From Swiss-Prot:
Family, as annotated: Belongs to the protein kinase superfamily. Ser/Thr protein kinase family.
Organism field: Arabidopsis thaliana
Coiled-coil zones: 301-395
Pfam families for this protein: PK_Tyr_Ser-Thr (PF07714), U-box (PF04564)
Protein name (record): U-box domain-containing protein 34
Its job: Functions as an E3 ubiquitin ligase.
Catalyzed chemical reaction(s): L-seryl-[protein] + ATP = O-phospho-L-seryl-[protein] + ADP + H(+); L-threonyl-[protein] + ATP = O-phospho-L-threonyl-[protein] + ADP + H(+); S-ubiquitinyl-[E2 ubiquitin-conjugating enzyme]-L-cysteine + [acceptor protein]-L-lysine = [E2 ubiquitin-conjugating enzyme]-L-cysteine + N(6)-ubiquitinyl-[acceptor protein]-L-lysine
Active-site residues from the entry: 564
Family annotation (PANTHER family): OS02G0152300 PROTEIN (PTHR45647), U-BOX DOMAIN-CONTAINING PROTEIN 34 (PTHR45647:SF145)
Taxonomic path: Eukaryota, Viridiplantae, Streptophyta, Embryophyta, Tracheophyta
UniProt binding sites for ATP: 448-456, 469
Length: 801
């Protein structure tokens, strides 16, 4: 872009044009070290040189340096010996955070490098006689420069915008007089335009940055200058040959220009350093005024020296003022920095204190809420504790009342027991020491029976064989059972009921008469090597048990029901007389229900499975005929030697089919079939499902059983006279009936002990007196079985007789 002025420029930092002269300004651009410059700038300069230079009195080239707001950081900045800055990739540091000396040195180096931009354009102006350099400070942001110049150019200027394909021109107003004008207003117009045009660079480059002169704080001129650091553009003025007057006028205006710029556009730089960097003859002093030397005309030597002295004095004075201002600025900056630090510190302390206060308030509020919750919980806990205390006190009172009642009940029971046991002379009261001594400290070898109630020990008390039953009194039910057994047995005296000899109530011990042959169950199932009972003994046992049950059922004032009648509770003495034992579960029936009425009662069942009355098990109602069901099962077991499970339907089917003999006990070979079948029918009637279908024990069962027993006794007496032992039952050596017959090598049977003693001394037969082939003995099982059967008959026949 090219601007041509026709008026005097009476201000600003550029050269002053004399009256009537043409002033040509060309804006150029280019890169540092570029030998050719920008293509557009070359076209503009070439066009201006070819078209305007012959007409112009002064020719100026302007280059705008970008605003320097930051410099490279020290760790990536290397200063070469050639004083060129080499910048690598990294962070940059704002100028206000760097020392002034570093900034000034960096500015000088950058300015020196930007002078190379004019080299290619100076070559194009070789034909010019003189050039003049001075510096302008411009900003390059904003609207385009050509448009701004076209918009604001006064009528006294001609503007040429040289583009690649066209030239845009704004001509002067033809009505304006081109003659030299001496009016101050007209001269100021051209000057104001160039000043505004120069200022437009500043405005367009940084429209939002404040002017350093607008700083309101003391000492902020240096900070604003550092923040908006800029350099004046290097400009070269190519002049035509001048007259002495023009040279003089130009020289005379230098102080005036210097004075104008001193108050407004002087950048905050160290001018002494700046003079050192600009050592060329044409450089302006302090980046504002340069020496003007006319190549055609030279002023007198004395006048030139005097002006130079005046300029130097003025520069010296300005330097002193600048140094003073810089010093004051530094002090103000230090004070400002200190004040800012204090403000920051106070602000930080205030913020911290505010945070602490807020935290304390929040903590206090939280603690209050927590305290309120804790208080509420505490009051709730206190109420719960008070309620628990009240409940505990009530429970404690109720417990004391219950303990008193229990103690009263215990004392009453104890009194009853003491009266019952202490005044009853029907049995003897033993001490625990006597029982322990008799049982040898309850030795396991003395145990003859064991059940759910406890253990039975064999002992001798008062030179009488006895059986001590030790009951476990670990539950109230067992204590009640023990007391009931004592109560019942102490009132009973019957030949077919076990006799109670004495008791030790404190330790739960009962002393019974001792029955040598054990229980009926051992004979039915042949346990403990018990021999099978003959049929007539079985008939008699059934009759004796019926008599004992009839005695219990007819007791006064209330009938007694055994409730646990079974073969294990029927004991046999040495003469095979049966007695009913274990009356512990016996019950005194106060309200006997009729047999033809089914009643349901809430009672605890007692007894053994398969022997419990089905109706009693179903309804809970106990009757005397409940024992009759167990009695019928015992009859069928004595006939068949089978388990009670399913025995009733099996015998019933056998009787109906006539196959009863197949179910009878095989250990007995001489069953009377007629009497046996009649006895089986009685057992089936007693084992009916309903009580109303069972016969009466005393009026219907006992008479039939008595008749059968009498028939059996008569038959046994007839057979007893013919019971003599055969001769082969006797041992040839001992002449006695043999117990363990053994066959020797001679074919004869001997008693084992006798033949072994004979063979130790002899090797011949005791009968034939001949030598024996060997000494081996063979057991004669057939003969031993026959001998045992004969002995049993003889023994039971003697019992019957």
């Amino acid at each position: 872009m090219v601007v041509m002025l026709t008026q005097e420029m009476s201000g600003g930092g550029g050269p002053k044009a004399e009256e009537g002269q043409l002033f040509v300004a060309v804006a150029v651009k280019g890169l540092i070290g570029d030998k050719l410059g920008g293509a557009g700038s070359r076209r503009a300069v070439r066009w201006a040189v070819d078209n305007l230079l012959p007409k112009a009195d002064k020719f100026v080239m302007i280059h705008v340096i970008p605003t320097i707001t930051s410099i490279p950081t020290p760790n990536i900045l290397i200063l070469m010996f050639t004083r060129m800055w080499v910048v690598t990739a990294g962070d940059r540091l704002p100028v206000e955070e760097v020392e002034e000396s570093v900034v000034e040195m960096y500015v000088r180096d950058v300015k020196k490098e930007y002078e190379t931009v004019f080299v290619p354009f100076l070559k194009m102006c070789k034909s010019t006689r003189s050039t003049k350099r001075y510096f302008r400070s411009r900003r390059t942001k904003g609207t385009g420069v050509p448009l701004t110049v076209l918009r604001y150019a006064p009528e006294t200027c001609e503007v040429y915008i040289v583009c690649k394909d066209r030239i845009t021109t704004k001509s002067m107003d033809p009505l304006i007089n081109r003659e030299p004008c001496t009016s101050p207003h007209a001269a100021a117009t051209a000057h104001d335009f160039l000043r505004d045009w120069a200022a437009s660079f500043h405005t367009l480059r940084s429209p939002t940055l404040p002017d350093p002169r607008q700083s309101t704080e003391a000492g902020t001129r240096r900070s604003a200058s550092a923040r908006e650091l800029r350099f004046e553009a290097l400009s070269l003025t190519c002049n035509k040959p001048k007259t002495p007057q023009s040279s003089k006028a130009s020289s005379a205006t230098t102080p005036e220009i210097f004075r104008r710029r001193r108050g407004s556009d002087i950048p905050q730089l160290n001018y002494s350093d700046f003079d050192k960097t600009c050592t060329k003859p044409q450089s302006n002093v302090e980046n504002i005024v340069s020496e003007h030397r006319d190549s055609d005309r030279s002023p007198p030597e004395t006048s030139r020296k005097s002006k130079k002295v005046e300029i130097e004095e003025e520069v010296e004075r300005l330097k002193n003022e600048l140094q003073s201002t810089v010093f004051k600025y530094k002090q103000a900056c230090e004070e400002l920095f200190s004040t800012q630090n204090k403000v920051k510190m106070l602000s930080t302390e205030y913020l911290n204190e505010s945070k602490r206060v807020n935290n304390a308030v929040e903590k206090e509020e939280l603690q209050r809420n927590t305290a309120a919750l804790e208080k509420e919980r505490y009051m709730k806990a206190v109420k719960e504790v008070e309620t628990a205390k009240a409940l505990l006190a009530r429970e404690f009172c109720q417990r004391q009342i219950a303990e008193v009642n229990a103690l009263r009940t215990y004392l009453e029971k104890k009194k009853v027991i003491d009266q019952l046991l202490g005044t009853d002379h029907r049995y003897r009261k033993y001490t625990i020491e006597e029982i322990v001594t008799a049982t040898e400290g309850f030795s396991p070898e003395k145990v003859i029976g064991e059940g759910g109630y406890g253990k039975v020990y064999q002992c001798s008390l008062d030179s009488t064989p006895a059986a001590v039953k030790v009951v476990r009194l670990d539950t109230p039910e067992k204590k009640q059972e023990f007391l009931k057994e004592v109560e019942v047995l102490s009132q009973l005296r019957h030949p077919h009921v076990v006799l109670l000899l004495g008791a030790c109530p404190e330790n739960g011990c009962l002393v019974y008469e001792y029955l040598e042959n054990g229980s009926l169950e051992e004979y039915i199932f042949h346990r403990k090597n018990k021999p099978p009972l003959p049929w007539f003994i079985r008939f008699r046992v059934i009759f004796e048990v019926a008599c004992g049950l009839a005695f219990l059922h007819s007791s006064k004032p209330e009938p007694i029901v055994h409730r646990d009648l079974k073969p294990g509770n029927i004991l046999l003495n040495r003469n095979y007389v049966s007695k009913i034992a274990d009356v512990g579960l016996a019950k005194l029936v106060t309200d006997v229900a009729p047999d033809n009425v089914t009643m349901y009662r809430n009672s605890v069942l007692a007894g053994t499975l398969h022997y419990i009355d089905p109706e009693y098990h179903r309804t809970g109602t106990i009757r005397p005929k409940s024992d009759l069901y167990a009695f019928g099962i015992i009859i069928l077991q004595l006939l068949t030697a089978r388990n009670p499970s399913g025995i009733v339907p099996a015998v019933e089917n056998a009787v109906k089919k006539g196959t009863l003999t197949e179910m009878l006990d095989k250990s007995v070979t001489d069953w009377p079939l007629a009497e046996t079948e009649e006895l089986a029918r009685i057992g089936l009637k007693c084992a009916e499902f309903r009580c109303r279908d069972r016969p009466d024990l005393k009026s219907e069962v006992i008479p039939v059983l008595k008749r059968l027993v009498e028939t059996a006794n008569s038959k046994v007496k007839k057979e007893g006279s013919n019971l003599r032992a055969p001769s082969h039952y006797f041992c040839p050596i001992l002449r006695e009936i043999m117990e363990e017959p053994e066959i020797a090598a001679d074919g004869f049977t001997y008693e084992r002990k006798a033949i072994l003693a004979w063979l130790e001394k002899h090797n011949i037969s005791p009968v034939t007196r001949q030598k024996l082939d060997h000494f081996k003995l063979t057991p004669n099982h057939t003969l031993r079985s026959a001998i045992r059967d004969w002995k049993s008959r003889v023994r039971f026949s003697n019992v019957v007789v």
